[in-house]
C-alpha cells in the first residue's frame, strides 16, 4: 500500500497553555530565574516537565568544562588557611603540583588525544588568574575568604537560594561577593557598568538579608 507523503505541521513560535503552570513553592535560584525571564520554554521543559540534559561533559564543551575546573582550582587553593599569605609564585607552584591530579579525577577529557591545546590553555589561564586575583585581594585588604557559600532568602514572596563562588571579608569588615566566569571578553564587565548583572544583584540581596549589610 502506497502512503501519501504527509509533511510535519509547522512549529508555532508561541505555545499557549490552557491554564497557568503551577511552579510550586520550591526555592528559585539565579539560574532558574534567568531561564524563566529569558527562555521560558527551557524553564518549563526543565523545571516543570522534569527534562534534564546529560551531565556528561565532552571535549567539545570547552568553556563549560574549563569553567568548572577553574572553580575547583580556586576552591582548593582558598581551602588553605594561609592562602592570602602565599606569594604569587608559591600559589602558582601549588597549582602546578595539583593540576595533574585534578585533571585525572575531574577533567579526564582534557587528557584525551586531541585535547592538548585546551589543556594547556586551561593551565595558562589558571596560572595568570591566580596571580591576578591574589594581587587584587591583597590591594583590597582581604582578611578572610570563603568559597561556595550557600545563602537563602526571598525575592518578594519567592524563596530564593544562591551559592557565591567567593565571599571576601575586608579589613574594615565590609564584604565582597565574587562570581568567577570563564570567558575572555567584556560581556560581564559591560553588565556591571550598565547595572544589569542580575546574578550579583541577587547575591547582594541575599547577603544583605543574611548579614544586615550589602556587600
Task: Specify the residue positions occupied by each region the protein language model found.
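A non-catalytic, helix-rich entry segment at domain boundaries
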Residues: 72-150, 154
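Active-site-adjacent bridging/hinge elements
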Residues: 14, 39-51, 100-101, 168, ...
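Glycine- and acidic
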Residues: 18, 22-31, 50-60, 76, ...
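Non-catalytic protein-protein interaction segments used by genome-maintenance enzymes to assemble
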Residues: 142-211
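Short, well-ordered alpha-helical packing segments
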Residues: 34, 45-49, 71-78, 127-130, ...
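Secondary-structure capping and boundary motifs in well-ordered enzyme cores
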Residues: 25, 33-41, 58-69, 91, ...
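Short glycine-/polar-rich loops that comprise or flank the Walker A/P-loop
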Residues: 214-215
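C-terminal, charged and often intrinsically disordered regions of DNA end-processing helicases
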Residues: 1-78
Amino acid at each position: 500500500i502506497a502512503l501519501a507523503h504527509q509533511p510535519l505541521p509547522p512549529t508555532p513560535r508561541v505555545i499557549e497553555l490552557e491554564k497557568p503552570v503551577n511552579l510550586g513553592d520550591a526555592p528559585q535560584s539565579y539560574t532558574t530565574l534567568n531561564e524563566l525571564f529569558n527562555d521560558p520554554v527551557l524553564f518549563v521543559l526543565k523545571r516543570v516537565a522534569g527534562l534534564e540534559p546529560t551531565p556528561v561533559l565532552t571535549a567539545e564543551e570547552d568553556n563549560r568544562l574549563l569553567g568548572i575546573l577553574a572553580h575547583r582550582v580556586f576552591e582548593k587553593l582558598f581551602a588553605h588557611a594561609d592562602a592570602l599569605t602565599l606569594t604569587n609564585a608559591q600559589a602558582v607552584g601549588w597549582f602546578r603540583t595539583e593540576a595533574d591530579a585534578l585533571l585525572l579525577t575531574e577533567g579526564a577529557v582534557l587528557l584525551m588525544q586531541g585535547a592538548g591545546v585546551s589543556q594547556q590553555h586551561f593551565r595558562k589561564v589558571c596560572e595568570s588568574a591566580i596571580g591576578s586575583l591574589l594581587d587584587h585581594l591583597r590591594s583590597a585588604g582581604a582578611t578572610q575568604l570563603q568559597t561556595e557559600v550557600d545563602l537563602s532568602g526571598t525575592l518578594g514572596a519567592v524563596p530564593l537560594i544562591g551559592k557565591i563562588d567567593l565571599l571576601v571579608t575586608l579589613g574594615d569588615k565590609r564584604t565582597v561577593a565574587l562570581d568567577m566566569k570563564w570567558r575572555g571578553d567584556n560581556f560581564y564587565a559591560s553588565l556591571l557598568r550598565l547595572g544589569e548583572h542580575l546574578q550579583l544583584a541577587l547575591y547582594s540581596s541575599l547577603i544583605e538579608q543574611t548579614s544586615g549589610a550589602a556587600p
